[in-house]
């Protein structure tokens, strides 16, 4: 129903390709839980176990009052308040990142400070993710829930790469997309599918369409897919981790993903409760 390209009056069809944006995150969540089920990763593991740059992070707080460490929820990087840095009370863990409670790139004061740093396009997870260890945290790990739109979950994607020995895109292709029959889901849309891409109304689509293929396979954003393909992924979750006789995760793991992981702060593991 509807139009896939309003200005040109082109009708929507079942094979149209959508920009999935943050619907990439549940795919990362399934990949992470595969690592956990296989005993390669524990939620309580510090990220520095794989990426040493995350060992000694700092948290941004307002300069005043000095007797309190206040981390504001939202800050404009072009209008930074006076601030100071304090040591993180503990290292951030896999669980912190999966539940958006790490303080990494969550839109607060630390993010505003970190946004002043290198803004060159990322090359790949291997070379880019260690740089995130130099970012300033928005709040003390585990003390708050605050959504990380485009950075934190890439750390988990890199851990999946390290433990699996595969680039993240190849891992999800082999372990998730192929078993589910998701043949129309990619980070880089093949040339023969370009004319099927849905045009977002009143948006400059050149930033999505007129770009070279990426080598940075984010766990936070970037996938393109069809409604039919993504329905297969969601149906697997509804079915308790299985579709077409192919089991990706155990029912127990799926229940864990959908349960409150933050003592009421907000989310499950990469899925909204």
Feature locations, PLM:
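Short, conserved catalytic-motif segment at the N-terminal edge
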Residues: 1-20, 40-42, 56-68, 208
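Short gly/ser-rich anion-binding loops that grip negatively charged ligand groups
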Residues: 17, 22, 84-87
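Active/ligand-binding-proximal structured segments within catalytic/core domains
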Residues: 28
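Short, surface-exposed loop or secondary-structure junction motifs
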Residues: 46-273
């Amino acid at each position: 129903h509807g139009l896939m390209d309003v200005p040109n009056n082109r009708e929507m069809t079942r094979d149209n390709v959508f920009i999935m944006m943050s619907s990439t995150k549940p795919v990362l969540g399934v990949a992470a839980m595969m690592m956990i089920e296989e005993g390669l990763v524990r939620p309580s593991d510090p990220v520095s176990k794989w990426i040493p740059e995350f060992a000694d992070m700092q948290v941004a707080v307002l300069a005043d009052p000095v007797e309190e460490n206040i981390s504001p929820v939202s800050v404009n990087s072009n209008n930074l308040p006076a601030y100071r840095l304090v040591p993180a009370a503990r290292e951030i863990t896999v669980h912190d990142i999966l539940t958006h409670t790490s303080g990494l790139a969550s839109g607060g004061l630390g993010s505003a400070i970190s946004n002043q740093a290198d803004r060159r396009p990322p090359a790949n997870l291997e070379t880019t993710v260690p740089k995130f260890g130099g970012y300033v945290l928005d709040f003390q790990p585990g003390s708050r829930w605050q959504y990380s739109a485009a950075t934190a979950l890439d750390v988990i994607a890199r851990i999946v790469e390290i433990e699996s020995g595969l680039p993240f895109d190849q891992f999800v292709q082999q372990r998730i997309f192929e078993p589910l029959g998701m043949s129309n889901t990619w980070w880089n849309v093949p040339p023969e599918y370009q004319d099927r891409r849905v045009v977002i109304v009143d948006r400059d689509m050149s930033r999505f369409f007129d770009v070279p293929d990426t080598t940075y396979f984010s766990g936070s954003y970037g996938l393109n897919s069809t409604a039919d393909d993504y329905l297969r992924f969601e149906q697997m979750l509804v079915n308790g981790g299985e579709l077409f006789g192919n089991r990706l995760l155990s029912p127990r793991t799926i229940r864990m993903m959908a349960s409150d992981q933050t003592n009421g702060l907000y989310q499950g593991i990469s899925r909204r409760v």
